[in-house]
């Protein structure tokens, strides 16, 4: 591949432990094939909060709150080789991690 090209990988997950495990797998795979790696860079965590009434029709003051957190990481692979791309394509990551790749 060209030397000035880079691969940007964005990872999203609800579980931060699963996300960190996946990022370490990607970084180790890229380093084994001779590419330079920048990251993982933690991006801001999105927190979605939902407030619902506890009772079906009375007690407006009684409410329950739920939240879900979306953790994100960014990895830049600088100067990737063809072997790097092949090994990243074969990499099997967890089902709870969303991977977005940009060239």
UniProtKB/Swiss-Prot annotation:
- Which GO cellular component terms, listed alphabetically, does the Swiss-Prot or TrEMBL entry include? ribonucleoprotein complex; ribosome
The record's InterPro entries line, in alphabetical order, gives: Ribosomal_uS10, Ribosomal_uS10_CS, Ribosomal_uS10_dom, Ribosomal_uS10_dom_sf
Protein's UniProt keywords contain Transmembrane helix:
no
Question: What molecular function does GO assign, one term?
Answer: structural constituent of ribosome
**Keyword Ribonucleoprotein among record annotations:** yes
Report the superkingdom from the record: Bacteria
Recorded name of the encoding gene: rpsJ
Q: What interactions and quaternary structure are annotated?
A: Part of the 30S ribosomal subunit.
The record's keywords, sorted A to Z, are:
Ribonucleoprotein, Ribosomal protein
Q: Name one GO biological process term.
A: translation
What is this protein's name?
Small ribosomal subunit protein uS10
NCBIfam families with a match to the protein in the record: PRK00596.1, rpsJ_bact
Family, similarity comment: Belongs to the universal ribosomal protein uS10 family.
Pfam families this protein is in?
A: Ribosomal_S10
> What exactly does this protein do?
Involved in the binding of tRNA to the ribosomes.
